[in-house]
Amino acid sequence: MAWVTKDSTETYNQTPEPPREYTKKEKAANWWHYHWMAVVVAVLVVVFGVWIIKDTVFQTRPDVQVAYVGTSDLPTDTVTALQDALTPFCSDLNGDGKVVVQVDSYTVDFDAANENTDAYYQMAGVTRLSAELSSGGKTYIFLLEDPEGFETQTGALQYLDGTVPDDPETTDADWREMVYRWTDCPVLTGLDLGGYEGLTLMDDVTGTNQSVLAHLYVGRRGVWDEKQIPTYEGCAELWDTLTAGAVSTAAE
């Protein structure tokens, strides 16, 4: 058998093909393919950082929080007027250079026999109220539609003389000795609150804001943990101011 070999002097055309020139669109697509995860992470970090800065620097934090607890919300005009009227009685407790009073509404019906209660709003109201009454809650002053139901269910109030029941879960606390009627308090009834237009966003009923608040009772949070007393010192001063000259008629 004979072997066929190539002449060692034979030459080949080894000129390589010129490299391909990618378009800008192809280059961008290639870069995105390998770096999209890093871009997403960077964007999330920036967004989170902006949110933190906004929350810590620009968010308005109330110096005083007042809670209204009733079966229906207060008119928006009433809430705004009350916040504005209480502001001159308060000071900058959180040191942010502003004095802000915030009235929070909790829609709760303590009458278990009421079949007209909206279960969704009831659950939402109870959940929010329970959270606020926890050890981290800031609310000290309460405007109550049903003080008996509130105290029976929460055991959160203190007596008007500043004492608290030995056991916050006691069932025999006399709520009548824990609250004033709004109309018992000369300072509160003397507030210039103006009027409201519409009990809700869906009607055009008008009236005075004092008439909306006249049927409410005013109570304050009981503090059993001495470590929490400094938390409510500023609010306690506000309570003393608002109830100055008041004589309770809750037992009548």
Model features per residue range: what roles?
Residues 187-252:
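Bilobed periplasmic-binding protein/Venus flytrap-like ligand-binding cleft at the lobe interface
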Residues 35-56:
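Hydrophobic membrane-insertion alpha-helices, especially the h-region
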